[in-house]
Amino acid sequence: MNRLPAIFLAMGLVRCAGADNPDDARWDFRFGRPALDGGALAAVWHDGELFVGGAFQGAGANFAPGVARWDGTNWWPVGEGLSATNAIGWTVTSLAVWEHELYAGGNFVRSGDDWLPGLARWNGTNWSALPGIAAARVRRLLVQNGSLFAAGNLQLAGDTNYYGVARWNGNVWETYDSRIGRTEGIGCIAVRGETVYVSGDFNVIADTAIPYNAYWNGATWQLLPGLTNQTFRTLAIHAGGLYGSGSFTHIGGIAANNLARWDGESWWPVGDGFDQAPDRLLSTPSGLYAVGSLKQSGSTTINNVARWNGSAWQSLGADTWPAAENPNELCLADDGRLFAVGYFFSVQGQRAGHAAEWTGTQWKPLVVNNSLALTDGFLSIFSIAADKDSLFVGGVYSEPAGASGRAVWQLKSNVWAKLGGDFTNIGGAPVIASLVVQNGQLFAGGAFTNVNHATIHHLARWDGDQWQPVGNITNGPIGAMVSDGTNLFIGESPAGFQVNGRTVKRWDGHQWSTLADQVNNGITALAWAEGDLYAGGGFTRIGTLAANRIAVWKNGQWETLGGGMDGAAGVTVQAIVVDGTNVFAGGRFATAGGVAVNNLARWDGAQWHPVGSPPTDGVWAPATAIMALTIRDGNLYVGGFFTGAGGQNIPALARFDGTNWTRLGSGLRGWEVATPVPRVRTMAWQENALWVGGLFPAAGNKSAVSLARWVAHPAMRLSVPESMENEAWRIRASGVTGLRFVVESSTDLQEWTECTRGQGDTDPWEFQDASSSSPRFYRTVLCP
């Protein structure tokens, strides 16, 4: 038997190359969508990889706002990406490669903290603004005649005019005197020789009344004839002719279905055209391609993408995209491969994310294989529970294909399963407010009256096959639940539900008993500790006890905790956690026991205190404030709908170590267009990892669709079998689930060399080091 000639060292957490925040290594990489999480509008081939731009923030496992690259296996960010403001619905609309560098145009305004007004250059390391541009909304970039053309609405530095076209030669901008209105813009451009063709929503260009379509003849702007009171969808030069698509059946007096060719004097049809206007035309040495919502060309069925063979249009593939989804941009790689991007969630019936490659016979989605994103559509998580083997989540979903509802799912052995059918509610929107695992049984509570077509009022138990009612109980909507390991406690009716006689009840597995009736407002938080039950909500009376929003059930009766919480309208306690003699309460309130606090307070058994010092530290919120609390190893984790903690910009999720407030890595992010501030509604621990649920697209530098996993204490370990394999040791890393890492080796513990990179798709993870036949040391290094 061979003896092990190596010593294995424990995991070390250090900053990997390019890591802005090394703690982002603790965020699980598996909960992003398999490709892009939003539509793609642009694509270009650069340095052997596909670059895609659009209105997305996640690409595979990574946070990648606006622009991402595909290396053939994985999606990656491009620097800090390109971001818009929360009032803009699209980000990157065009990409081009000029002079060996990547250029992006769109409606973005920044990359990270750097201001970039709509036009940017990527040098392989950083995004930067182009000289001379004061502001820009770029719709199309085009490389022609050794120059870069930008079309849209651009303003040059020191110039008050707005231009529809600008040409960059590397030193200066030439505008062709393309002055247009401030709110107008050019949507497409084509260049042939010195002639520049444009189309857009303008009525005057260079002080000349020319509506929608024009061309620059080298000296002046002229009307491009053919269309009246409408624009072209796209323009392209192919085989010496100008091709234009739009919504027309006639152009320049000739019949043409949504596509025509201009020879400099007249318009001509291009075969039978299409039933819809192509979104983009791509000229290649092998022919002209068209892409869009294309279904017919004369009697020929078209599958969204077609190639012109000189006499007719031929479809690329069949039955590829669902009816309401389609690609809208094409890209040709240097090696002849064709890519399509757009707005589509499936390809050939396979899960996709807005990007695909033509294999020569069919379209193939460009996806990573390790995605555990629950849906490719909308997802908002309201409740989480976990046991040793499974994660349970309850929330609202909307699939791209149209299905939507409220449901509970189980994640076990890296496979999601929907538990039963949807939850519905007569008279209002259903809510799955709380999940609890007790003695191997899963309970779901909230506002619902029906589960999978069976009548169940607000509380259900999963029996392994279907949802069942719990005992003979008539209760109102449930706002909170907790278990002491034997008994299940429920608090009725969150604020907003009109239910008389809200109660706190206990289920012992056989029968119900009431701990409090006539609670005058909703219960939204319950916590159990050391034989005591804590309740929080919007109430001012619980049973016969006057109590402001928080109380404790102790020795068979309710007691107050000081003077409770007060503040402006909507005062409520929504989360409680107990740590020894300290009780932490979070929600929406200004004072606790008369002490000034910001939505978060600590009860020491005698009086209330702010969390942090001074009291203005607290947690600042625009609306709902704190919705979830948990404690581990002396750290208080706070989740909710807030923008800052401890005077710092820390949105939605914060950690307090007793002295300082910090983010978890670089923190959670919001959707810039729809929900700029992320929201956390629920948290739960599973061994050494914290699960976070709510409404957000990313956690740290990872894409994470409303569900994220933070590994608080990575427990990575290296080991080897007892024998060699092919004269080399096979090295095993365990405790790596959801983590990226580097394995390094050394012969002297001074100089370390990277052996390989890995990621925890499987646990344990193994690799073979051909150099391991000689003595050496190994270590693993976490990498964001």
Each predicted region: which residue ranges?
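Extracytoplasmic surface signature
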Residues: 3-715
